[in-house]
Amino acid sequence: MNLKLVFESGDPVLIGVFVLMLLMSTVTWCLVVLRCIKLYRARKGNAAVKRHMRDTLSLNDAVEKVRAVDAPLSKLAQEALQSYRNYRRNEASELAQALPLNEYLVIQIRNSMAQIMRRFDYGMTALASIGATAPFIGLFGTVWGIYHALINIGQSGQMSIAAVAGPIGEALVATAAGLFVAIPAVLAYNFLNRGTKILTQDLDAMAHDLHVRLLNQKDS
């Protein structure tokens, strides 16, 4: 489609459609790049944390080794150990007497996991919304363009194939633009959603390991 012609024609609706498409595409690719970098760093850091946790018998020593690692598993391990220490320091409190260590750790670890995962959820709603709405916005632009093309053709009195095919063909590209924006957004959403699920599985496994080791902890 001749976008220059669209902008020169001054039709505010078509201009708005293509500007919106451009913004949605920009947001999509920015989110894809930022989220991919974040997931890559998280996976790399988690691999280091797993290695230290596996090779170190003492949980206290393992947590100290991974403290400097910027990774979700490192944060979970630190917060779980801190929760254990807080419980032991306040065993005489009413909360400690009413809530066994086992249940207390489950609650605290689950809360930590939820807070960590919130950091990896940003942008997913935007990608899903763009993937779902972009084709319809493009279709709206096409319908609008065809409508005005037919009006202009009727007013000019030129009903030849060439006169009809040109303006309508240009209007149809708005739908293609919508698909061009939507397809990367949908693919990115699925890819990032898969990465987030893998991260959640790693957190679940680490949470179970921390829970068992803390229950068998002899000292804090």
Curated annotation (Swiss-Prot):
Quote the InterPro entries the UniProt record gives: ExbB/TolQ_transport, MotA_ExbB_proton_chnl
Q: Does the keyword Calcium apply?
A: no
The UniProt entry's GO biological process terms, in alphabetical order, are: protein import
Q: How does it sit in the membrane?
A: Multi-pass membrane protein
A single cellular component GO annotation: plasma membrane
The answer to keyword Secreted applying to this record is: no
Swiss-Prot/TrEMBL keywords: Cell inner membrane, Cell membrane, Membrane, Protein transport, Transmembrane, Transmembrane helix, Transport
Tell me where in or outside the cell this protein is found. Cell inner membrane
Transmembrane stretches in the record are 13-33, 126-146, 168-188
Major localization listed first in the record, in broad terms: membrane
What the record says about family reads: Belongs to the ExbB/TolQ family.
User: Subunit structure, briefly?
Assistant: The accessory proteins ExbB and ExbD seem to form a complex with TonB.
**Task of the protein:** Involved in the TonB-dependent energy-dependent transport of various receptor-bound substrates. Protects ExbD from proteolytic degradation and functionally stabilizes TonB.
Q: What name goes with this protein?
A: Biopolymer transport protein ExbB
Say which species the protein is native to.
Neisseria gonorrhoeae
Q: Which gene encodes it?
A: exbB
